Amino acid sequence: MRECISIHIGQAGIQVGNARWELYCLEHGIQPDGQMPSDKTVGGGDDAFNTFFSETGAGKHVPRAVFLDLEPTVIDEVRTGTYRQLFHPEQLISGKEDAANNFARGHYTIGKEIVDLCLDRIRKLADNCTGLQGFLVFHAVGGXTGSGLGSLLLERLSVDYGKKSKLGFTVYPSPQVSTSVVEPYNSVLSTHSLLEHTDVSVLLDNEAIYDICRRSLDIERPTYTNLNRLVSQVISSLTASLRFDGALNVDVTEFQTNLVPYPRIHFMLSSYAPVISAEKAYHEQLSVAEITNSAFEPASMMAKCDPRHGKYMACCLMYRGDVVPKDVNAAVATIKTKRTIQFVDWCPTGFKCGINYQPPTVVPGGDLAKVQRAVCMISNSTSVAEVFSRIDHKFDLMYAKRAFVHWYVGEGMEEGEFSEAREDLAALEKDYEEVGAESGEGEEGDEGEEY
């Protein structure tokens, strides 16, 4: 079996986790108490959904997941929520005091007290797997638990499970909407370790997803629940082929192979289509070509950056529902002829497609319409550099005056770590610039030295 262990860190990670497991349970017909009436064989471990759920002797399905936070309030919502019986109490780990938006608290002082307990729980989950294929990590880098404890945990996972792939779903700070003053510091420090310790990172940003909810679903004032449900559709589409059978199945390690041209260039954009409200869907059924085009629309991107400003290196299209390979090939051929969608010249094919026959499931009472077919796109584009340069700029403005730095140093960090992380990101921006440049002007020499 190819099991995946999910790790949800900090408030963002946990709330995305809630939406995600709610959706998975609906997709597989698992009740909130973990029972699955449709699953006749008790303890049968060969079903496709066992990649994400383990089955107990009593026929209860338990997510292979750990939720962790440094303060209890958010996890207490899981402990008392609808799905409280789904999780084993040991999977919900909470500390006593907050990381207080401080990377250093999450990474050094408070994080290091809890990290061994987390690794212990993860080890238990891993021992329960027959063929662990990797970890999915959900966190935000603007706060402190997601950034500090998230980085610490990823570093430790690299040591303990060196060869297993790690996929991150990372909420980055948005250009306009800010939740804390020190976001730029936390993000830069955290990205510094994401660069080294994740294999693929999917960037999400709240503002972009707000706009999608407002524009496509006509929700005037989207809540986090609206956002998280949209994000969990994306994550569900990504993992659908691990959980259901289809024509073209895609493994987690396959994302890495197909999307990451150089180890550092692994920050992905994602988009999902069709995002339409129930009222509209009643009147229109979208074809494969239409949803494919809409997945490439800059407005569909779940991070605030414009793919027209960069070039695509690779892109992965995951279709689900009523889709046949012939339609997919036609849609992809059309995309390739469009001048607005440009690929780097050293990657001529650039597309990986997956098809899964399970149509998208929607949460009852949710905002998304039930549709026959949907597509989720994960793409590696040089325009992602915009996200980093925006954060770097804000970092520089604050760091020039050393504003707020004493809070980090007081928690046992050294000032040198700031400049080291910032230099690493400067190098990353440069890497993206070089990758997007036209090849052939003697750049091959430089690249050989760099990687």
UniProtKB/Swiss-Prot annotation:
Undergoes a tyrosination/detyrosination cycle, the cyclic removal and re-addition of a C-terminal tyrosine residue by the enzymes tubulin tyrosine carboxypeptidase (TTCP) and tubulin tyrosine ligase (TTL), respectively. Acetylation of alpha chains at Lys-40 stabilizes microtubules and affects affinity and processivity of microtubule motors. This modification has a role in multiple cellular functions, ranging from cell motility, cell cycle progression or cell differentiation to intracellular trafficking and signaling. Transmembrane segments: none annotated. One of its GO terms (cellular component) is microtubule. It catalyses: GTP + H2O = GDP + phosphate + H(+). GTP binds at residues 11, 71, 145, 179, 206, 228. Its cofactor is Mg(2+). It is an enzyme of class 3 (hydrolase). SMART domains: Tubulin, Tubulin_C. GO terms for molecular function: GTP binding; hydrolase activity; metal ion binding; structural constituent of cytoskeleton. It is found in: Cytoplasm, Cytoskeleton. Residues 431-451 have a biased composition (Acidic residues). GO terms for biological process: microtubule-based process. InterPro entries: Alpha_tubulin (IPR002452), Tub_FtsZ_C (IPR008280), Tubulin (IPR000217), Tubulin/FtsZ-like_C (IPR037103), Tubulin/FtsZ_2-layer-sand-dom (IPR018316), Tubulin/FtsZ_GTPase_sf (IPR036525), Tubulin_C (IPR023123), Tubulin_FtsZ_GTPase (IPR003008). The record marks 451 as: Involved in polymerization. Its EC number is 3.6.5.-. Residues 429-451 are annotated as: Disordered. PANTHER family: TUBULIN (PTHR11588). Dimer of alpha and beta chains. A typical microtubule is a hollow water-filled tube with an outer diameter of 25 nm and an inner diameter of 15 nM. Alpha-beta heterodimers associate head-to-tail to form protofilaments running lengthwise along the microtubule wall with the beta-tubulin subunit facing the microtubule plus end conferring a structural polarity. Microtubules usually have 13 protofilaments but different protofilament numbers can be found in some organisms and specialized cells. This is Tubulin alpha-1 chain. The lineage of its organism: Eukaryota, Viridiplantae, Streptophyta, Embryophyta, Tracheophyta.
